[in-house]
C-alpha cells in the first residue's frame, strides 16, 4: 500500500542524458491559463509571435496576427531550442519576471501549465527551500527550466521533432497517441514506460513526424525541422517552410512578411525560391526547381536542381492554415497531416516485461524522472487565486 501511494504521489518526466553544447528544435505543449494575445504567449516563452502561429498552422500572415486574442484553455505547440544543461536535455532560455501575488506554485502550475515544477524552478534559481505558496518578490527574474528531448531528431530512423506534453485529466496513452498521429507502442518506447499508464501532470515526450532540412553546418538555421502539417519561419521571417500533407519533404517559399530580404533567385537561373518548372518529353518529364539552402552569413542561399522524372509533378499542396480560434475545441491538439507509412494511432502495445524505466532495445536512450508532487494538491487553489488576482490588476 505504501509503495502504491508513493507511486501515485510522483510525477514522471522523460529525460535525456547529454553532453556538449549542441541544441535541437523541439516543441513545448502549453495550455493557456487565461485569454492572451499571441504576442503575450510568445513573450512568455521568448518566441516570435508569427513563428508561434506557424508552428500551430494558424494564419501567421494576416495583418495584426500578433495582436489576436487566444482563448483560455487553448493547447499550443511552442517552438524552442532544446539545449544540454547539467547533463540533461532542457530548455533554459526562458526568463520570467514575477508579478504581485505570484508564488512558485502559481508560476509552475498556472503560468507555465505544469511544464516545470516549483521545486525545479527553486533549484534552477538557487532559492531556499521556502514555502512554494509564499509570495515572490515582484519583479524578481526567474529562470524557468522546461522539459525537452532531442533523441537525434529521429524516431524509428525517420525525422522527428519531439513535443513535451503535460498529461491532462482524462488522458490515456491511447487518446494521446491518437491525437498526435502516433502509436501507443511508440510513445511507450520513447518514454521507457513499463506499462501504458499515465497520471495528470506527467510529462511525455511525443514523437511527431517531421520534414528535415539538409542545410550546411555554416547555416544559422542548420538543423531546421518542421512538424508534419505545420510551418516554420526562418531567415529573419523572409522564408516560410512547410511539411506535408502529401509527403515529408521540406518545401520553402518566400514568406512576404518583410521587405528586408536578400535575393531569393537561384544562381544561373531565372527561377526564384520555391519555383518549379516541368516540361513533358517522350522520355518523361524534365523538372527544375529552386530550393532553400539555409541562411549562410546573413544571406539566403538557394540551390538549383534539374532532372528527369517519370511524370510531371502537380501543383504543390500546402498544409491548411486555420484562422485564430475564438473558442476552445476540447477534442485534441492540432491534428497533423496524414504521414506516409504504417502504424495506426492508438495501436495495441506489446507487453514489456517488468516495470523498469529502461528504454527497450532500439529505442531512444531516455529515462523517466519522478519528482515529488507535494505542490500539486495546491494547483486548483492556486489557479483560482491567481486568475482572480490577475483580473483585478
Predicted regions: what is each one?
Residues 38-53, 104-112, 118-122, 167, ...:
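Short alpha-helical segments in extracytoplasmic peptidoglycan/chitin-binding modules
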Residues 314-318, 322-379:
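C-terminal GPI-anchoring signal of eukaryotic secretory precursors
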Residues 2-23, 388-393:
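N-terminal signal peptide
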Residues 24-32, 91-94, 246-253, 259-263, ...:
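Extracellular/mature segments of secreted proteins
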Residues 11-24, 48-91, 117-156, 185-223, ...:
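Extracellular LysM carbohydrate-binding repeats and other cell-envelope/extracellular binding modules
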Residues 26-30, 35-41, 60-64, 92-97, ...:
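Short, recurring structural edge motifs at helix starts
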Residues 238-240, 258-261, 280, 285-290, ...:
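Long, charge-rich, low-complexity intrinsically disordered regions
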Amino acid at each position: 500500500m505504501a509503495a502504491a501511494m508513493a507511486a501515485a504521489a510522483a510525477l514522471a518526466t522523460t529525460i535525456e542524458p547529454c553532453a556538449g553544447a549542441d541544441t535541437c528544435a523541439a516543441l513545448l505543449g502549453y495550455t493557456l491559463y487565461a485569454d492572451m494575445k499571441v504576442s503575450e504567449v510568445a513573450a512568455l516563452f521568448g518566441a516570435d509571435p508569427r513563428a508561434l502561429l506557424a508552428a500551430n498552422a494558424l494564419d501567421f500572415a494576416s495583418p495584426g496576427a500578433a495582436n489576436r486574442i487566444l482563448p483560455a484553455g487553448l493547447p499550443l505547440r511552442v517552438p524552442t531550442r532544446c539545449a544540454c544543461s547539467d547533463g540533461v536535455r532542457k530548455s533554459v532560455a526562458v526568463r520570467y519576471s514575477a508579478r504581485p501575488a505570484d508564488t512558485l506554485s502559481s508560476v509552475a502550475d498556472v503560468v507555465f501549465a505544469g511544464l516545470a515544477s516549483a521545486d525545479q524552478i527553486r533549484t534552477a534559481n538557487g532559492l531556499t527551500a521556502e514555502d512554494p505558496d509564499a509570495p515572490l518578490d515582484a519583479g524578481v527574474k526567474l529562470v524557468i527550466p522546461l522539459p525537452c528531448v532531442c533523441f537525434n531528431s529521429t524516431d524509428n530512423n525517420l525525422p522527428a521533432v519531439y513535443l513535451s506534453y503535460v498529461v491532462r485529466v482524462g488522458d490515456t496513452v491511447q487518446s494521446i497517441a491518437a491525437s498526435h498521429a502516433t502509436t501507443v507502442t511508440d510513445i511507450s518506447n520513447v518514454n521507457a514506460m513499463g506499462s501504458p499508464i499515465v497520471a495528470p501532470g506527467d510529462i511525455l515526450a511525443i514523437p511527431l513526424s517531421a520534414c528535415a532540412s539538409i542545410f550546411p553546418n555554416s547555416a544559422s538555421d542548420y538543423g531546421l525541422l518542421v512538424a508534419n502539417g505545420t510551418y516554420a519561419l526562418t531567415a529573419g521571417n523572409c522564408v516560410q517552410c512547410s511539411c506535408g500533407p502529401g509527403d515529408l519533404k521540406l518545401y520553402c517559399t518566400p514568406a512576404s512578411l518583410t521587405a528586408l530580404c536578400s535575393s531569393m533567385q537561384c544562381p544561373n537561373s531565372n527561377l526564384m525560391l520555391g519555383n518549379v518548372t516541368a516540361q513533358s518529353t517522350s522520355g518523361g518529364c524534365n523538372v527544375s526547381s529552386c530550393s532553400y539552402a539555409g541562411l549562410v552569413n546573413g544571406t539566403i542561399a538557394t540551390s538549383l536542381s534539374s532532372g528527369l522524372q517519370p511524370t510531371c509533378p502537380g501543383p504543390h499542396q500546402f498544409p491548411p492554415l486555420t484562422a485564430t480560434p475564438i473558442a476552445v475545441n476540447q477534442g485534441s491538439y492540432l491534428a497533423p497531416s496524414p504521414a506516409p507509412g504504417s502504424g495506426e494511432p492508438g495501436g495495441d502495445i506489446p507487453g514489456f516485461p517488468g516495470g523498469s524505466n529502461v528504454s527497450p532495445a532500439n529505442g531512444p536512450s531516455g529515462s523517466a524522472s519522478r519528482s515529488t508532487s507535494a505542490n500539486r494538491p495546491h494547483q486548483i487553489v492556486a489557479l483560482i487565486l491567481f486568475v482572480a488576482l490577475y483580473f483585478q490588476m
